[in-house]
């Protein structure tokens, strides 16, 4: 990996071998920055800041990350260039037009102290966790979520207008419902598969019969996640509230997840060790 003007790195090359890598160094020398660069190549975002310009070295106008991988018997090249105008992504020297086509090329999983906030923070943090992981696994999910967010922004803007276009509101609601069915089903499946993998590992670590689980809270019951008409009825039922508030109050942008240990909410009953 090569880092140019990324955080405190002016122009640095780093090589990794197979197996476990242990990164050692004094404080403020760039250990976390190195991991941040790897994670940026996976998700095209930082886990520490929402502003890409914060990643650019002081007094510079851009940064570059070059990553060379060897997998599946062949060499692969990834490049990320970020400047004040935005991101430029490349695979094997070819420009990538859509971020969704780049995310997941490097499938990295990050665990850091801030992850403890997953249980105590707002539902937005839990949705973000699911969205990031699913985006690395499914381009369809990434594209559908992006389209939904665009439609949601348009619907909210429409709700704030004095003269409401009823036909356009209906069209937006229908298009959003189509997206939401895909999003809800993929979120539900992801959580089911995640916990199926986690349960035996958790029991092994805890060395007891503690049962971990989750409840996915969304706008439809788990048995009706593909019921488009039911979702549209909810939009219609919430129409007056949406008009009064000037925003859409029903949808997957309000989803949440409750994590449990032996049926009890992790946030209220789990120890710090259990949360980790």
Language-model segments: what does each one mean?
Residues 55-58, 148, 187:
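Intracellular alpha-helical coupling/juxtamembrane segments of multi-pass membrane proteins
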Residues 1-26, 167-276:
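Conserved NTPase motor "head" modules and their coupling/switch loops across ABC/AAA+ ATPases, GTPases
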Residues 41, 132, 136, 151-154, ...:
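Conserved, well-folded catalytic cores of nucleic-acid-processing
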Residues 142-176, 209-211:
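Extended, charged coiled-coil "arm/hinge" scaffolds of SMC/Rad50-like chromosome-maintenance ATPases
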Residues 129-132, 154, 175-182:
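A general alpha-helix detector
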Residues 42-125, 131-141, 195-199, 227, ...:
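Nucleotide-state sensing region of NTPase/ATPase domains
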Residues 17-54, 271-276:
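Phosphate-binding glycine-rich loops of NTP-binding sites
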Residues 5, 34, 55, 65, ...:
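Conserved RecA-like P-loop NTPase ATPase core
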